[in-house]
Curated annotation (Swiss-Prot):
<dbReference type="GO" id="GO:0005886">
    <property type="term" value="C:plasma membrane"/>
</dbReference>
<feature type="active site">
    <location>
        <position position="67"/>
    </location>
</feature>
<keyword id="KW-0443">Lipid metabolism</keyword>
<feature type="active site">
    <location>
        <position position="111"/>
    </location>
</feature>
<keyword id="KW-0378">Hydrolase</keyword>
<keyword id="KW-0106">Calcium</keyword>
<keyword id="KW-0479">Metal-binding</keyword>
<comment type="similarity">
    <text>Belongs to the phospholipase A2 family.</text>
</comment>
<feature type="disulfide bond">
    <location>
        <begin position="69"/>
        <end position="144"/>
    </location>
</feature>
<feature type="disulfide bond">
    <location>
        <begin position="79"/>
        <end position="103"/>
    </location>
</feature>
<keyword id="KW-0395">Inflammatory response</keyword>
<dbReference type="InterPro" id="IPR016090">
    <property type="entry name" value="PLipase_A2_dom"/>
</dbReference>
<dbReference type="GO" id="GO:0031640">
    <property type="term" value="P:killing of cells of another organism"/>
</dbReference>
<keyword id="KW-0732">Signal</keyword>
<dbReference type="GO" id="GO:0042130">
    <property type="term" value="P:negative regulation of T cell proliferation"/>
</dbReference>
<feature type="disulfide bond">
    <location>
        <begin position="48"/>
        <end position="64"/>
    </location>
</feature>
<feature type="disulfide bond">
    <location>
        <begin position="70"/>
        <end position="110"/>
    </location>
</feature>
Amino acid sequence: MKTLLLLAVIMAIGLLQVHGDLLNFRKMIKLTTGKEPATRYSFYGCYCGMSGRGTPKDATDWCCRAHDCCYKNLESRGCRTKFLKYNVTYQEDQIVCEDADDCKSQVCQCDKIAANCFAANLKTYNKKLRFYNKFRCRGAAPAC
């Protein structure tokens, strides 16, 4: 029981590190993959979850690296991505970002692209990379 509680606390901390609208991002991932994002992607590989480093381990990890880069690009243009709420709808299993505000719309697009990337790479998802030890991530981080 203590192990389960500790795991829940660790996942919550990891999820708090994510920028943007966490609840909408979770819904997007759930819609596109059918999987529970907290257990599947929060600590996957070298880039999913908090603070990525090294060389991404596989296509799913590259999705997370691209997502990080997408947010960094927005931040360099003056968008504040941390906890930025956006409006999104789902029409016929499609994600539709609806904000007129450019930063909100772009954060939504970053999340949408990542969710679709996860879905496109479900077949190569590697369970051994779940809860991967980030200290094992070596090599130079790929440029954005």
